[in-house]
């Protein structure tokens, strides 16, 4: 029997990434087959030919963007030494960048932008600051530590980050962990981790995110949203906080559960609190309140509890 501990003072949630965009199962399978076919059988073709084969007959801009996103995150690796050799990716052909197959966020964003352009998608490259970015430098008059993209789908701009979507960099170097969390991110989610000094798309103005508030938001805030928290609640909580963590992670089964309803407070207030989680994996889930273990009631795949803090 699996038991998940939900701590009372700081909610400890596994970061089970939810799909950023949902396709019907049969459509997803068809796109996946197309992607795998082009990657496995068309490797000898040049980039333009592979892109045409990848997107030929695709009418949906969302599907085109997804195919390109997946192509980039599955092909390129994060490699700072290679990035130093490349320098400005704009001075290299797409063929050369694909042959090298790696680099920094500048390479990822440049390749993504050029492929979006070739596919007829309206897209932009964004220079700004990101929560996990390092080595902040001045780009013109703006502080910059990361580069990403935005693409317009059905009249709305969405954040796309192929760098973070490709995987993570740890002590052992780059580990490929493809994720859809960074594809077509909703604006209210993107503002938790990305700050565009120019606010080109009005995301920060819409949600009242200033530079000072952005600095307060903890790095894990976006992952709390990935686990199921409402991004607006996370953002509102940070307006009065000091940047305390929202999420704590420990050994878990990735994607094991989804948050349906939970407080987004660093410290629980003395009023009834409703917890509702959904999981096909865990048989039992509990809240630890002081020295008490309080079991959530299970009905089907839903675990729920109304908690009255002492």
Segments (PLM) and residue ranges:
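Secondary-structure boundary elements
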Residues: 23-104, 110-113, 119
């Amino acid at each position: 029997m699996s038991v998940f501990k939900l701590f009372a003072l700081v909610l400890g949630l596994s970061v089970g990434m939810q799909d950023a965009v949902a396709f019907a199962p049969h459509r997803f399978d068809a796109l996946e087959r197309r992607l795998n076919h082009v990657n496995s059988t068309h490797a000898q073709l040049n980039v333009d030919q592979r892109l045409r084969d990848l997107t030929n007959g695709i009418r949906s801009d969302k599907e085109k963007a997804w195919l390109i996103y997946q192509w980039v995150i599955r092909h390129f690796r994060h490699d700072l030494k290679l990035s130093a050799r490349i320098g400005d990716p704009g001075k290299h052909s797409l063929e050369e960048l694909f042959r090298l197959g790696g680099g920094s966020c500048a390479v990822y964003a440049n390749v993504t932008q050029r492929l979006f352009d070739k596919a007829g998608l309206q897209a932009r490259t964004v220079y700004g600051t990101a929560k996990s970015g390092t080595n902040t430098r001045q780009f013109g008059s703006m502080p910059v530590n990361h580069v990403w993209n935005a693409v317009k789908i059905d009249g709305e701009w969405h954040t796309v980050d192929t760098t973070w979507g490709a995987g993570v960099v740890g002590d052992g170097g780059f580990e490929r962990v493809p994720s859809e969390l960074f594809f077509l991110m909703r604006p209210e989610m993107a503002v938790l981790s990305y700050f565009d000094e120019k606010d080109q798309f009005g995301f920060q103005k819409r949600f009242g995110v200033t530079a000072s508030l952005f600095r307060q938001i903890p790095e894990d805030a976006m992952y709390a949203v990935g686990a199921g928290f409402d991004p607006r609640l996370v953002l509102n909580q940070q307006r009065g906080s000091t940047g305390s963590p929202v999420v704590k992670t420990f050994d878990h089964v990735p994607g094991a559960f989804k948050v349906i309803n939970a407080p987004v407070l660093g410290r629980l207030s003395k009023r009834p609190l409703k917890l509702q989680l959904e999981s096909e994996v865990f048989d039992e889930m509990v809240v630890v309140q002081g020295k008490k273990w309080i079991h959530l009631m299970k009905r089907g795949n839903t675990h729920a509890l109304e908690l009255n803090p002492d």
